[in-house]
Swiss-Prot record:
Tagged with keyword Cytoplasm: no
Protein name, UniProt field: Cytochrome b
Signal sequence, start to end: none
Protein's GO biological process: mitochondrial electron transport, ubiquinol to cytochrome c
Main location: mitochondrion
Originating organism: Microcebus sambiranensis (Sambirano mouse lemur)
GO molecular function, one term: metal ion binding
Cofactor note: Binds 2 heme b groups non-covalently.
Positions with a binding annotation for a ubiquinone: H201
Keyword Mitochondrion attached: yes
Chain positions recorded as heme b b562 binding sites: H83, H182
Task performed by this protein: Component of the ubiquinol-cytochrome c reductase complex (complex III or cytochrome b-c1 complex) that is part of the mitochondrial respiratory chain. The b-c1 complex mediates electron transfer from ubiquinol to cytochrome c. Contributes to the generation of a proton gradient across the mitochondrial membrane that is then used for ATP synthesis.
Transmembrane parts of this sequence: 33-53, 77-98, 113-133, 178-198, 226-246, 288-308, 320-340, 347-367
Amino acid sequence: MTNIRKTHPLMKIMNSSFIDLPAPSNISSWWNFGSLLGACLAIQIITGLFLAMHYTADTATAFSSVTHICRDVNQGWIIRYLHANGASMFFLCLFLHVGRGVYYGSFTLYETWNIGIILLFTVMATAFMGYVLPWGQMSFWGATVITNLLSAIPYIGTDLVEWIWGGFSVDKATLTRFFAFHFILPFIISALVLVHLLFLHETGSNNPLGTSSESDKIPFHPYYTIKDLLGLMFLLLTLTILVLFSPDLLGDPDNYMPANPLSTPPHIKPEWYFLFAYAILRSIPNKLGGVLALIMSILILAIIPVLQTAKQRTMMFRPLSQIMFWILTADLFTLTWIGGQPVEHPFVTIGQVASILYFSLILIIMPTVSLIENKMLKW
């Protein structure tokens, strides 16, 4: 008798996606982050659902409802901190996942890559709106500063900002709609993830060598399910240590003060995972230019496949490109650091140099280095 997982209409889909899926035999731990992102999304949806049961999206009670969750709800504090720090783990895995894609040339799977970029934007939008919900000082001022950037759009800018705010400032209407969007977007993300996987399974996974895996495939289960479980254990261990020992390590102390429109915090800054983009935004004196640079800092990922000049898919055997890649990584760390610093000398100059280097590396230096490597390899 045929196994039910191979005949049942629904289980057949699951089987071909996660059990009998032919996978390259040589993919490394860098390929773990896809499943870890799925786990992060599940954690965020479950904890978020429980938080939504006790949260009130109203300017008068939002801050106290979060306090109520932490103090009065059974295990409320751990649900709240799992959700807050789960977002950090989510972005950590996202950045590593994208970095792996750039290093090993996974961007040549165009459809998967482009859906991935849409996913990145959607997750960033969700995280931004979620940060506004506790209605602390940094929530309020972060929302004010970032939404206000849209006023840089010529002609329709001011109207657009007031339309998003639902009034003439960030207020009750803004909080209510941000809560509604923050609730619905993770489900849209889940649907996009399925499309992402659909396109991935059309072509099959890339591998560290960048060569075709057609002649050497192994079943996903048990080989990669056990490998993914190990990665999941490390993820949960890190998240648990963070939540139980220093839950506020990655947060901002200003957010423990209720939102006050009459008092501006000394340094308005987003969560750590947006700091690199925030640094790029601040490094350009012109408002519209800054907004365009901010969008391009992520959207530049969509141009990477067009700029691919190398004859080899991965950077595994291209030492010069590897050096450029790690300089780019160091540059992103620098931008993240600068984004958290006040707007004063020498941080402004460092930020501007790092921003120019970021775009130069991706648009000019790395494609040129790839061409040089082609010449060296007589290709």
